[in-house]
Amino acid sequence: MQNKGVVLTLFLVVSMAIVISSTKEKRAVIQKKYVDFKDRKYPWKEECFETCARTFTNGDQSKVSEVVPDYFKCICYVLI
């Protein structure tokens, strides 16, 4: 009977730790930001990725979730 209590307690502690850690990961926010692009009217998507990553994440393209080329600018969706 004591083994069941120990196993149940251990299960509850581990499940609470998983819930707490997953809650912290979900706090990341995607922000919409703008970057001016003066080289051409409508920049290529790769250029927007590079420009957004360089401007907002010190070159880390994995934090840039999406980019939208626009008239002389790039719209960046950045994970903060």
Curated annotation (Swiss-Prot):
Keywords: Disulfide bond, Secreted, Signal, Toxin. Disulfide bonds: none annotated. Expressed by the venom gland. Residues 1-22 form the signal peptide. GO terms for molecular function: toxin activity. Contains 2 disulfide bonds. One of its GO terms (cellular component) is extracellular region. It is found in: Secreted. Belongs to the scoloptoxin-15 family. This is U-scoloptoxin(15)-Er1a. It comes from Ethmostigmus rubripes. The lineage of its organism: Eukaryota, Metazoa, Ecdysozoa, Arthropoda, Myriapoda.
